[in-house]
Amino acid sequence: MKKLPFLIIIIYIFLILISISSSIDYNYNNDIDNNNNNIINRNKNKNKNNLYNNKVIIKNDDNDDEINNKFKIRLDDNEDQDIYNEYHFLSKVHNRLAFNIFGSSSENSGSGSNSNSNSKNTDSSTGPTPSPISINGTLNSTATVYWSGGKSSCKSVNCTEEGFSTGDSYACSYEITPTYQRGQWEKGVKYFKDPLPKSILTSQVVGVSFVINGVVGCTPLKQELTTIEFLIQDVQVGQTISTNRSDDCSCGICYKDYEILPQSYDLLGYNKSGLNKVQLLLLDNSICATSLDIIFYYHPSTIPPTPTPTPSKPTISLLKKYLIIGFSIVGGLLIIGGCFLLIRNRYRSSGYYKPDKNDYTQIKDGKDIDIHQIKIGVRIGKGNYGEVYLGTWRGSQVAVKKLPAHNINENILKEFHREINLMKNLRHPNVIQFLGSCLIPPDICICTEYMPRGSLYSILHDQALQLQWSLLIKMMIDAAKGVIYLHNSTPVILHRDLKSHNLLVDENWKVKVADFGLSTIEQQGATMTACGTPCWTSPEVLRSQRYTEKADVYSFGIILWECATRQDPYFGIPPFQVIFAVGREGMRPPVPQNGPPKYIQLLIDCLNENPSHRPTMEQCLERLESIDSSGYSDLQYVRQQL
């Protein structure tokens, strides 16, 4: 053991000598190889840019045999000359044609005809069509927004028979009757996060294209064209789009793709770090849509080619010498430090570790916090991981959470310290305020602000309280703001244990998110109580899939259900059965019978099986703020029976 550090140092010096001897030839040969590769890549890119970027795919439903069809296409580039190119196509089983050569999109069937078999308007004119921009040599990133709420009037088999695709949900820009609602169109406005890579500048973006997954021309009594404009951040993208296509709109979940060619876009007012507003604005006629794809085209970052170097005698520069010396010194220090840590860790593991004053965590004003400075009062909470006490520190009431001695070990201390460093940097009115901590065993604790009304769970289950809908919605708005702050932090903080027990309420009924930093630690060595965390956990996480922001949205939906019913989710069902029923069989709590319709619909959307179809927390906040709760009676607590 004592000879191990010296052996590591000898090996390190040997590797440094080898690297110095080989650096000359390697750098010289590598420079020549890199230059040759640059020349080859430039030639490849040059040839690639010469390719014409138009593609035509025709598939025919009328015949399953391979029929040789002729189709003539006149390209816009040859409009001054009567030049036609003849193409041959093999027909197959599908009838979808994405036809973009003339700057418009149409759906075609048969063996090459460009007329629309579903169109009720025989006029082939589509009005002025914006000229496409060149996207040669670009990459693209896509953001997708979804519409929902439309009443389904057909099954997926109808979509297959008619050659459509089947969507999960939809909304229309019009209604048939007030009782036959066509979803939450909301003037075609949706919000999306920037899909571009963080390294891409707005100046590298050349344009945007769109794909409407839906049906167009939905007002059969109107004979005019369907006229559409696309706006991002209230700025129109490209020109007005017109089409005479008319689809069968009776079945909203059945859709086709309506593709819009790339349009120029200068990203005026575009938000690279947050949400952006997109609007599908109908000027004439109407549509039904399941989703909208927003495709950004951008030039990748390029490195200018370097001139071919003239082979010269391989030499090593003075700068390289200094770099090698510097790296050697730094590497040596790292090895010495590593050896020290190795010896200290072995010393600690043998039972001789004694923490010192440096284990205190500094609070925000730069002063140490000592557990002996806090006057511990009555116990106000208890969990599997420890106990929470009401304390008095510097004349103010605080909450002190203590870890039990039997849970304390070196790994717990490291995780505890990491989470404290995260918590002390968070400042938001709807996030519990961290005051300080102590890491000296056995007094391992954190100190936070005291919330006199306790948890939201205790309020919902207080028989003496009658809660108004306006108050419940206000508290949910507070909770949404707190979670949004965590999701937008750097790095992103995923709560992972969002439930009514972890939403604390102050004397003014303001809700603050708590226990987002310690949930992983607190579960170690703990046994879940009846109806524990699985009741708030999303189905994909119960299936051991990746935890994302949408998992927190699902947990938020369960809390919305708790507020609407003042009951425990899955009451009386053991946790292991909840895991199977929710994760594998799609079980959900029953839909509440009383409450504002917008609130109930938001609750349902948050519990969607598909994470991508759940709203974001920003959308949850926006929808909560728009709810009118007037006219709904107060919610009373009703004891649940097994």
UniProtKB/Swiss-Prot annotation:
Q: What InterPro entries does the annotation carry?
A: Kinase-like_dom_sf (IPR011009), Prot_kinase_dom (IPR000719), Protein_kinase_ATP_BS (IPR017441), Ser-Thr/Tyr_kinase_cat_dom (IPR001245), Ser/Thr_kinase_AS (IPR008271), Ser/Thr_Kinases-Pseudokinases (IPR051681)
Chain positions covered by the region annotation Disordered: 106-136
**Domain named Protein kinase: which ranges?**
374-627
Source taxon at top rank? Eukaryota
Q: Which GO terms describe its cellular component?
A: cytoplasm; membrane
Q: Name one Pfam family in it.
A: PK_Tyr_Ser-Thr
Extracellular topological intervals: 24-322
The answer, when asked if Transferase is one of the entry's keywords, is yes
In this UniProt entry, which cysteines form S-S bonds? Answer: none
Q: What class of enzyme is it?
A: transferase
**Catalytic site positions:** D497 (proton acceptor)
**Parts of the chain that traverse the membrane:** 323-343
Q: Which UniProt keywords apply?
A: ATP-binding, Glycoprotein, Kinase, Membrane, Nucleotide-binding, Serine/threonine-protein kinase, Signal, Transferase, Transmembrane, Transmembrane helix
The record's section on PROSITE patterns has:
PROTEIN_KINASE_ATP, PROTEIN_KINASE_DOM, PROTEIN_KINASE_ST
What does the sequence similarity comment in the record state about its family? Belongs to the protein kinase superfamily. TKL Ser/Thr protein kinase family.
Name the record gives this protein? Probable serine/threonine-protein kinase drkA
> Which species expresses this protein natively?
Dictyostelium discoideum
The top of its lineage is:
Eukaryota, Amoebozoa, Evosea, Eumycetozoa, Dictyostelia
